[in-house]
Amino acid sequence: MWNWAHLGIFFALSLLVCLCGFKKYVYFMSIGYGFSVAIIGVAMAVMSLMGIYPMSIANFIQFALFFIYGFRLSGFLLIREIKNAAYRKTLAEATGKEVPIFVKFFMWVFMGVLYVAQTSGVAFRLFNKADNSVCQWIGIAISAFGIILEAVADKQKSEQKAKRPDMVATEQLYKIVRCPNYFGEILFWTGVTVSALDCLVDVGQWITVILAYICIVFIMFNGAQRLEKRQMARYGNDKEYTDYANKTPIIIPLLPIYHLNNVDKK
């Protein structure tokens, strides 16, 4: 079943959090993104405590994972921007000029819809009053692993960049894959999707969950592509970087996709 009133609540909360994007449009997709996921998780927990949704350990773990994932991600991005002047410069160069207000308004609404869709796998389980299942627990395990991987990758990157600001991170997780943090995000949403596979009751729910998953995977690959483009502009003539990039998968470990841009291998 669909509970449009509750989806409307989640949408309104997401729009509220994403208002920060009117200051810098990139915030719609960064700080607003994480905090939207976090606040939707909190809303689900509160509504469950009010008796609106079934209460179970598995459900509350998923609410907690939404909060941890979103709060950690946006908190990390916010602190990095405040403390790191080099990152602020890179962010300014990457975003370029501010966009017109009507474009911001469209992005605001679109991102609000997207973030509700991304979390809809858990919402549909609540709406359908589905029992806990093996699928849900497998999804929880995948999502938890994704959060841990992303957090460790961010920490390792910060440590390595502090030691070598003139080079990309290449050690530890970065020996296995060049964008382990993006891979962690894909894993997190893979877990959310897997957890919902046995509780969806109509075509609309299936379409919403699958399209949201495709969108986030596309966004992660696009993010990796843009990151690689910036790295190529900065380190493209550095043999150490090119050797590393030519032999290390860009976003999925063991998958031999090394570049998402046209590259002349030297």
Residue map of PLM features:
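C-terminal ends of transmembrane helices
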Residues: 14-24, 75-81
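Hydrophobic transmembrane alpha-helices
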Residues: 2-14, 18-21, 36-70, 120-156, ...
